[in-house]
């Protein structure tokens, strides 16, 4: 979001044209990989990754924008948001990734928790 305009949207899911984990099974569950570890062992992309891709595909610049997401970004998404120039991240649920917090803070990305009703 920039200047009260939605620039792009993203969601957690498999790449375009590929079957979702619900259809083929979750490799992370099958291998007992805990949440927050071994991000490369997943068919899906995080919503933050998809929003950056969608913005790029449609020519929208995210520099200075605010990204709203369900949980605090993981470190992979945090690095991508930093490089995309995102100025602020607003999330509802926490995610235990201290390195992501540190990197966003060091990069000057504002972090806000969306208030619960």
Model-identified regions with their sequence ranges:
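Zinc-dependent deaminase catalytic domain
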Residues: 1-117
């Amino acid at each position: 979001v920039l200047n009260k305009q939605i620039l792009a949207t993203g969601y957690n899911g498999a790449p375009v044209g590929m079957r979702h984990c619900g259809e083929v099974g979750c490799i992370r569950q099958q291998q007992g990989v805990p949440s927050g570890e071994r991000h490369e062992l997943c068919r899906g992309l995080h919503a933050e990754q998809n929003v950056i891709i969608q913005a790029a595909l449609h020519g929208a610049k995210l520099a200075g924008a605010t990204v709203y997401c369900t949980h605090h970004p993981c470190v992979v998404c945090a690095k991508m948001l930093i490089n995309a120039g995102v100025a602020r991240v607003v999330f509802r649920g926490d995610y235990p990734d201290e390195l992501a917090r540190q990197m966003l803070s060091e990069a000057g990305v504002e972090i806000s928790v969306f208030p619960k009703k």
